[in-house]
A protein has these predicted regions:
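Glycine-rich, charge-decorated loop segments at or immediately adjacent to ligand/cofactor-binding or catalytic sites
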Residues: 2-16
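Mature-region segments of soluble proteins
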Residues: 9-13, 38, 103-108
């Protein structure tokens, strides 16, 4: 099937010491491949347990390229209600293991973010239990922040929202929750945020591993 986020490749490449159910292989957050292409890579690189290789049958998608716009016919998760949420998820997922709400407990999940302390912002929302989140972060509290529902579909991971949230949160020592390295896939992003590393330097620190991945990826592509 198509992948709605194959139009770019970005993010730190997973360090296997942070391997988990949410990140199993040494790929970036956005790897720019269909599930068939990704399966070819897993097989070809021997990433299955014990290095085994499976018999793989892939039915190619007709008239598809990595830049083909694709809107999922149904929501892939209760907390990814529409195409905008799917597009913003790779960027906003980095706020999940922090004190900041990404809209769980609203009907705009992964399209907004905020915290009760961000009172300089006019936009606000109040998370409440719903089908996708029985006990959302900051339940019943007014959160102030940013509304991203109308912004253009990103062409890279947007670090600006993570940097903005960290900069505006008053108690830096309590900003990160357990599992930030598991979501980001690396140890240094958290350290860079704490240090105040500028965004261009953060991106530069990804570049070598990201370029290696792009070369590896090219071996397994089915679509232009």
């Amino acid at each position: 099937r198509p992948n709605p986020n194959t139009h770019y490749i970005d993010g730190p490449v997973l360090n296997l010491k942070h391997q988990s159910f949410v990140g199993m292989h040494p790929v970036p957050i956005v790897y720019g491949m269909t599930i068939g292409e990704y399966a070819k890579m897993i097989n070809g690189e021997g990433w299955l347990k014990g290095g085994i290789r499976c018999k793989l049958d892939i039915i190619p998608i007709q008239n598809y390229t990595h830049n083909t716009a694709y809107k999922l016919p149904i929501r892939p998760s209760p907390n990814l209600p529409n195409a905008q949420a799917v597009a913003l998820y790779p960027s906003l997922c980095l706020l999940e293991p922090t004190v900041v709400s990404v809209g769980r407990g609203t009907n705009q999940q992964f399209q907004i973010y905020g915290h009760p302390s961000f009172t300089k912002y006019q936009f606000s929302f109040t998370p409440q239990p719903n089908f996708g989140s029985k006990n959302p972060k900051h339940k019943g509290e007014v959160c102030y922040g940013k509304d991203l529902t109308q912004i253009e579909k990103p062409k890279r991971i947007e670090l600006q929202w993570l940097l903005d949230a960290y900069s505006n949160f008053p108690d830096k020592d309590t900003f990160f929750l357990k599992g930030f390295e598991r979501i980001s896939g690396v140890s240094n992003l958290k350290k860079q945020l704490i240090k105040g590393t500028p965004e261009p330097e953060i991106r530069k620190s990804w570049s070598e591993e990201l370029n290696k991945f792009k070369r590896l990826r090219s071996k397994y592509l089915i679509y232009p």
